[in-house]
Amino acid sequence: MYVMDEAFDGWYTPKTYHDYSRIFAENWQDDLTTMIAKDYSHPSVILYSIGNEVSETAFPQGVETADKLTRFVHALDDTRPVTAGINVLLNVYAQKGIGVYKESGPYKPEPLPP
């Protein structure tokens, strides 16, 4: 079995209220370091993913973020390639200011478990 070790499903742009974008800026380095340290010796892990369907890549800041994340991963493990799942349709929507993952209507917070 081959494994793509995926770190994030988003960076700065929220898909839902409780997703990783709320803490990305403060935690991405620690989380990548932990993930790579955990899986570095696993022979099934053949590549790393720095994002899945991240619409930020439609903008210069997103391209810079992808480059920064890739360089960081390669500094920790230069033996595996790094990829990101880019959904071009989401990028088009992002360019037009449409957030397909945004919740419709007023936000109603859900209680979080203790």
Give the label of every model feature segment.
Residues M1-P114:
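Substrate-binding/catalytic cleft of secreted carbohydrate-active enzymes
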